Amino acid sequence: MKNVDDLIDSAAELAEHGLSKGEIADELNVSRETASWLVERAGGNHTDTETAATTSTADIHVDWSALGRDSTRLRYAASAMADLLAKQGEEVDLTVGIEKAGAPLATAVANQLDTDLGTYAPAKHQWDEGDIDEQGGGFSRNFAAIRNRDCYVVDDIITSGTTMRESIDAIREQGGEPIACVVLVDKRGYDEIDGVPVYSLVDVVRVDREE
């Protein structure tokens, strides 16, 4: 995808397949607000582009499909992510992937670090509009349980930090202790979230120039 029109078309296609706006945000690696805007644009419910640019918060789309579609490349990326975590805690025996895209990354990271694997489905996957606090996430029972264990948390992109913060809270509610988080790309440049160190292969900083 090279431009906004491509993203709008992709958002429309995903919406037609029944994905919620939160799931569309996850698929396109943008914020929930951006996903909602793209879907509205696809439906013809939009303002002039210039007006939209001045009234909405800009976002950055990240396409890492060149890694995701090739198992060897994905393994190499996960190896680098695992290396960032390697010195964080010798007692860590569980890696939690945030669904959807964080799960395959976490699988490869867990393999590198020889830990068990868990997955967490965030609340945004159920979100279409309104207050996301009315939705709830959950851990898959098909994978390892938290059970008061120290954990690493893995995702692909940090856009606002909301999903990572939710995942950290959910782990703590289960009695677990998040030791560190790692992502491919961090759009916000976090050093930590709620006291948990955050590591990324790439930090993205948006620079706005005022003429």
UniProtKB/Swiss-Prot annotation:
The keyword ATP-binding does not apply. Belongs to the purine/pyrimidine phosphoribosyltransferase family. GfcR subfamily. Keywords: DNA-binding, Transcription, Transcription regulation. One of its GO terms (molecular function) is orotate phosphoribosyltransferase activity. InterPro entries: GcfR_halob, GfcR-like, PRibTrfase_dom, PRTase-like. The gene is gfcR. Disulfide bonds: none annotated. It comes from Halorubrum lacusprofundi (strain ATCC 49239 / DSM 5036 / JCM 8891 / ACAM 34). It holds the Pfam family Pribosyltran. DNA-binding transcriptional regulator that functions as a regulator of central sugar catabolic pathways. This is Transcriptional regulator GfcR. It comes from the Archaea. Transmembrane segments: none annotated. One of its GO terms (biological process) is pyrimidine nucleobase biosynthetic process. Contains an N-terminal DNA-binding winged helix-turn-helix domain and a C-terminal regulatory domain (or effector binding domain) resembling phosphoribosyltransferase (PRT) domain.
